Structure formats: C-alpha cells, structure tokens
Design a protein with these regions (language model features):
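C-terminal "post-core" interaction segments
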Residues: 1-134
Length: 134
C-alpha cells in the first residue's frame, strides 16, 4: 500500500475483529481509531453432535501475540485514538468514528507523497497449462 492506512474498531469487534485490530496495531500499519474491542478471541470447533442433532461447543483455541501474549482475551485491544459514538448517532445517521478516521487519513495524506507504484517489470504469465499433470 502506498500512502497512509487507518482502521476502525469498536466494542462490537470480537473474535477476528479483535485479532485484526490487535495485529493492525502491533505491526504499526497505521492508527487504529474507535473504541476498545470486547476481547473474545478463544475459538471453538462445533464438532460434538447430540442425538437430537444439536451441536455442542467448548473453548479450544487461544491466540497469542508477541507483544501482549494472551492478554487480548477478556480485555480486547485499545485503539490508538479513542473516538466515542454518541448513543443518538445512529438515529441521526451520523458516524462520528468514520468521520474521525477520514479526517485522520486526510491529515496523514498531507505529509505523505503518494504516487503510482514503481514499475516492477514484466508481469508473470498466469494462463493455465494446456494439459494438467497426471
């Protein structure tokens, strides 16, 4: 990506939303804006079927990060810039968090030269082979 990147998260981001938000912040891709994620990253595998067809699950998979270990679970990830969405924002069709992210991206663009990517040479030939290997 050439140019600045910002990401939004909030208290409704859990599971992959927690993981993405934390990885985005940990790798320093750009500023993370919004509210702290809810902290539910333990994975399940619905593989135990009961006689009535219902399926049971139990916590099985945990996520570990180089900077905080297992600490995203039960806490979440704090954004770099906290932006509250007021309770009436949805009713008024107002997205304060999105507006803040766009404003931040535009601020970052002011100090970042952005242009077309450099020529990387000839593109690879991606046509399928005429015959598939046996």
């Amino acid at each position: 990506v050439r140019g600045p990147v910002v990401a939004l998260t909030n208290e409704y981001a859990g599971s992959d939303g927690d993981i993405f938000s934390h990885a985005f912040k940990m790798f320093g891709v750009g500023p993370l804006l919004g509210k702290r994620t809810w902290g539910g990253v333990i994975g399940i595998w619905p593989r135990h079927e009961l006689v009535d067809g219902a399926i049971t699950t139990q916590p099985e998979f945990s996520f570990w990060f180089a900077d905080v270990g297992f600490a995203v679970e039960n806490y979440g990830t704090e954004p770099d810039i906290v932006v509250e969405n007021p309770p009436n924002a949805d009713a008024e069709d107002d997205d304060v968090q999105l507006d803040a992210a766009v404003k931040k991206a535009l601020e970052l663009l002011e100090g970042t030269p952005v242009g077309p990517p450099e020529d990387v040479g000839p593109y690879p030939k991606l046509t399928p082979p005429e015959t598939l290997p046996q």
